[in-house]
């Protein structure tokens, strides 16, 4: 008697156009990052980035719209790293909110402090265009990063409600972005402070669904 074969769930494939666009954006942003390692943002043009990425200036314009749009795309990717760090730290510290937040925040702040665009923002000539991206014009970054971060609280051991996950996500993204534009003193452990601030809410509203 033969046993029924296990049903294999179909692999969700990313449409070609979507995958191609993501690859293009990453290639352009990687090229921009490489340029920022040796030049200040104020000295970089769309043509410079296009040459470094091996594509036309028009292609960059079509994808990002402008030099400011390119900077916003870079900032969005940096915010994605915050989401990835917090999600990974929750996976690595099941049942321990404080350690999860502490690890996630420390990883993000270390990465952002070493990021060439952030360094360019904080050094050299004033760059109001970059500062606007994470202050007055930060809504797109906050909205996207918060939406991506929320499932880390609803779909993991934390198991909050959607509403509480949104509260946590927005607070984390807004607070972390504020420290990118105005870093704390060198002897101040802001990651620990934020972990202490966020943990009580998460402990109160999370189910902590640990097997």
From Swiss-Prot:
The keyword Transcription is annotated on this UniProt entry: yes
Source superkingdom: Bacteria
UniProt KW keywords: Cytoplasm, DNA-binding, Repressor, Transcription, Transcription regulation
InterPro entries named in the record:
AlkX_C (IPR040611), Homeodomain-like_sf (IPR009057), HTH-type_TetR-like_transc_reg (IPR050109), HTH_TetR (IPR001647)
Q: Which Gene3D superfamilies match?
A: Tetracycline Repressor, domain 2 (1.10.357.10)
Q: Which GO terms describe its biological process?
A: regulation of DNA-templated transcription
| Key word Transcription regulation present | yes
* Gene Ontology terms: cellular component: cytoplasm
The domain section of the record reads: Contains an N-terminal DNA-binding domain and a C-terminal ligand-binding regulatory domain. The C-terminal regulatory domain can bind saturated fatty acids.
Complex formation: Homodimer.
- Described function: Represses the expression of the alkB-rubAB operon, which encodes the alkane hydroxylase AlkB and the rubredoxins RubA and RubB. Acts by binding to the promoter region of the operon. In addition, EMSA analysis show that AlkX can bind to the promoter region of mmpS1 and mmpL3 and to the intragenic region of mmpL11, suggesting that it may participate in the regulatory network that controls the expression of MmpL lipid transporters.
PANTHER family recorded for this chain?
Answer: HTH-TYPE TRANSCRIPTIONAL REGULATOR BETI, HTH-TYPE TRANSCRIPTIONAL REGULATOR RUTR
Q: What is this protein called?
A: HTH-type transcriptional regulator AlkX
Give the taxonomic lineage as stored in the record.
Bacteria, Bacillati, Actinomycetota, Actinomycetes, Mycobacteriales
